[in-house]
């Protein structure tokens, strides 16, 4: 160290003054400490293999990096960021040869590599909890395939459905959200190393080698693109925001259902009032719902930071990264909680079935039955609307018969078998009749659950394979490092 606490590296220019703390990112850099060590090790191994630096210098640097790791992030010397602080620690330990660590490299490609390295791990964690939520929804669907409940549009009773059909609706959206996260992961898992500041390097580096040592799928081809672009952050945060928006709808439904007595939220995921001891509040799902605002806010903040930036590197990018961490942490936590709520919720079948018949919610099914008997659907619609108007709730066979005769001039039996209308008036019968693909009938639900579980199995297998691939790369890097130290 030099007098006054200046870092060893880059100490000759612009090292002091009030801007020092403003420029520093050390407060948030603990998150990428391990990533930077891995990136440093892969870079040093590659430099030695390419004869850019000697084996002795490589061994000394790698040994110093091991000491830095053992001491931990909090033991780092002062620095503008974790990258500079680690290099300073290496130079202090090794001497001048420690400065060879940064050969053929800029902080620009180094920082980008560290962000990608850490973000990909976070994305895998996010994918894992989203798949777990889908699995919980599939389990609910399988268990509640015949549990009839009211379905709503505009929060008004619309048509009878089932708990299973409701659960599967979210499982489907979350499957697409999983795909978006996987797409973001694929474009995150590319190496920018070797780009240097933005225009490459005169040294004979092997970009593919460092990419392989770090488990990246390949390299970002153009050096300026590799060093300067943060579109992978925007894609990841956008995918996370989509997950959060999906879960906000799920959470809103659970809060609404709890208010109506349609679902029993486990005590583990509820709270009571500080003054009203009888209260059981679904607070966790209210916070899950609010997470969408945080995630979309991070998305907007990130996009605003990135818009209009000229090529190649701009310090604005330092402020961009935190928005990604905010989104991935908040969304992952919220999805994990949502999965727990879904997995432990109780569904009171008798109460749900009774509520399913309220508000003449079987009206559409009755109109369908009349249309199946030969009435034009619009005429059938008029009949049922009149039955609802005359009968208030309207859910009686007599009301439908009277309305049919009033509109058509014929008795109900001349249009359709009254038994068909009676079945359509019954919430259970109404659900059973809607057996088209994707519908709520038990047979349709059974097929849908099988498809959903096939998708879950495929995504779980892909996730396990990707984690194994990264673990293999980490083992391979450790083996290469052990050849020097």
From Swiss-Prot:
Coiled coil: none annotated. Keywords: Amino-acid biosynthesis, Arginine biosynthesis, Cytoplasm, Lyase. One of its GO terms (biological process) is L-arginine biosynthetic process. Belongs to the lyase 1 family. Argininosuccinate lyase subfamily. This is Argininosuccinate lyase. Pathway: Amino-acid biosynthesis; L-arginine biosynthesis; L-arginine from L-ornithine and carbamoyl phosphate: step 3/3. GO terms for molecular function: argininosuccinate lyase activity. It catalyses: 2-(N(omega)-L-arginino)succinate = fumarate + L-arginine. InterPro entries: Arg_succ_lyase_C, Argininosuccinate_lyase, Fumarase/histidase_N, Fumarate_lyase_fam, Fumarate_lyase_N, L-Aspartase-like. Its EC number is 4.3.2.1. It is found in: Cytoplasm. One of its GO terms (cellular component) is cytosol.
């Amino acid at each position: 160290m030099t007098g006054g606490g200046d870092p060893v590296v880059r100490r000759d220019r612009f090292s002091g003054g009030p801007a020092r703390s403003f420029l520093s990112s050390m407060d948030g850099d603990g998150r990428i400490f391990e990533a930077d060590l891995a990136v440093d090790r892969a870079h040093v191994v590659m430099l030695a293999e390419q004869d850019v630096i000697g084996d002795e210098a490589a061994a000394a640097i790698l040994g110093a990096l091991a000491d830095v790791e053992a001491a931990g992030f909090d033991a780092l010397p002062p620095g503008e960021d974790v990258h500079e602080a680690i290099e300073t620690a290496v130079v202090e330990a090794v001497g001048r040869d420690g400065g060879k660590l940064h050969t053929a490299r800029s902080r620009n490609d180094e920082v980008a590599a560290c962000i990608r390295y850490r973000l990909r791990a976070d994305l895998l964690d996010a994918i894992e909890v989203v798949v777990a939520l889908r699995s919980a929804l599939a389990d609910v669907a399988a268990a509640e395939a015949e549990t009839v409940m009211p379905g709503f549009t505009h929060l008004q009773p619309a048509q009878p459905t089932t708990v299973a059909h409701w659960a599967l609706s979210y499982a489907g959206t979350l499957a697409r959200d999983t795909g978006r996260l996987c797409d973001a992961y694929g474009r995150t898992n590319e190496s920018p190393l070797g780009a240097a500041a933005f225009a490459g390097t005169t040294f004979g580096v092997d970009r593919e080698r460092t990419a392989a040592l770090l488990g990246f799928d390949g390299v970002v081809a153009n050096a300026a693109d590799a060093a300067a672009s943060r579109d992978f952050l925007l894609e990841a945060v956008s995918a996370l925001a989509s997950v959060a928006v999906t879960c906000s709808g799920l959470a809103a439904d659970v809060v609404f259902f709890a208010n109506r007595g349609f679902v029993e939220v486990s005590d583990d995921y509820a709270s009571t009032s500080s003054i009203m001891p009888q209260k059981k509040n679904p607070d966790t799902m209210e916070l899950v719902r609010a997470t969408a605002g945080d995630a979309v806010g991070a998305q907007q903040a990130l996009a605003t930071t990135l818009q209009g930036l000229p090529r190649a590197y701009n310090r604005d990018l330092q402020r961009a990264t935190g928005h990604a961490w905010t989104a991935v942490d908040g969304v992952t936590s919220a999805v994990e909680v949502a999965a727990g709520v879904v997995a432990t919720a109780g569904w009171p079948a008798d109460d749900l079935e009774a509520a399913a018949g309220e508000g003449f919610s079987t009206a559409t099914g009755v109109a369908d039955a009349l249309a199946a008997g030969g009435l034009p659907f619009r005429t059938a619609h008029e009949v049922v609307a009149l039955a609802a108007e005359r009968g208030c709730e309207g859910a009686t066979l007599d009301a439908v018969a009277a309305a049919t005769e009033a509109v058509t001039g014929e008795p109900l039996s001349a249009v359709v078998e009254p038994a068909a209308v009676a079945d359509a008036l019954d919430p259970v019968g109404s659900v059973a009749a809607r057996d088209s693909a994707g519908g709520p009938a038990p047979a349709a639900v059974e097929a849908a659950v099988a498809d959903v579980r096939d998708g879950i199995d495929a995504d779980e297998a892909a996730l396990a394979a990707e984690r194994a691939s990264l673990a293999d790369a980490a083992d391979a890097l450790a083996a290469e490092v052990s050849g020097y130290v």
